[in-house]
Amino acid sequence: YEITTRLVGSEMCIRDSVVTGYGTIGGCLVYVYSQDASVLGGSMGEMHAKKICSIYSMAMKMGAPVIGLVDCAGLRLQEATDALDGFGKLYLSQAMASGVIPQIMAVFGTCGGGMAVAAGMADFTFMEEKSAQLFVNAPNALEGNYKAKCDTAAAAFQSKETGAVDFTGDEASILAQIRTLVSILPANNEEDFSEADCQDDLNRMCTGIEGVAGDPVQALSMISDNHFVMEIKKAYEPSMVTALIRINGVTVGCVANRTELYEDCLLYTSPSPRDA
């Protein structure tokens, strides 16, 4: 792992509350930025944004994923419009990278205000399940609400109610899932990711698959290489399953509904017969 520019003209701090660098995960090149809440609260400022945008620029040139490890107090007020401009440049970098390289973000601490928008622009968002906070406006900003009543910034709410978070867990499990995700995704939109080494037999029998048709996670596990299934947005609307699997080394996206567990949850393109 190599750390990139430590000093980008900032007089505030040698790191300006974010560490940027690049390295490999299972032989795959990745670019990473990690916000440091112990320095200026990890807040977004002009140089902070420049360091992250620099990482995006390098990742786009090399065609490699960007991973963001977030712990940000939000906008650095003392930098005023310069900090606001920094958010704008970050959003532009993310928009230009969308559909070109994978963007993965993991929220380990606070992710408030403008940084929450950046998390929403990522392709995959992870969130630490106990102490992480993700919000544009704090829970107390909602009329009649307070944090103890309904913590709209917590991982449970963001994963179950809004669907803004794809995966939750402790720090170790999140890092492990990110490593797994990087290993099954193409590095960019032009990479020939047709096949990876696969020891599983494509033509093997899936005995008993007819008995698990009502629970697609089990069915997908049976047809996938080495029974690998990575379910996305697992907590959000459990009657539907979205997942990534591998078949003969090829990564495949899957969508299915759990008819066995939620047999009454049907999708209608016209008004439901029950409404008649």
Per-range role (PLM):
Residues 70-190:
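Conserved catalytic cores of soluble enzyme domains
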Residues 33-35, 67-70, 106-108, 127-129, ...:
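Generic beta-strand/beta-sheet core signal
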Residues 1-9, 14, 268-276:
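Single conserved hydrophobic/aromatic residue that forms the stacking wall/gate
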Residues 10-11, 15-98, 103:
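Long, structured ligand/cofactor-binding scaffold of large enzymes
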Residues 6, 10-11, 15-30, 36, ...:
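Intrinsically disordered, low-complexity segments enriched in small/flexible residues
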Residues 48-49, 84, 120-123, 248, ...:
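Short, solvent-exposed amphipathic alpha-helical segments in soluble enzyme
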Residues 32, 59, 71, 117-119, ...:
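Hydrophobic alpha-helical segments that mediate membrane insertion or helix-helix packing
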Residues 51, 177, 269:
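Charged catalytic carboxylate motif
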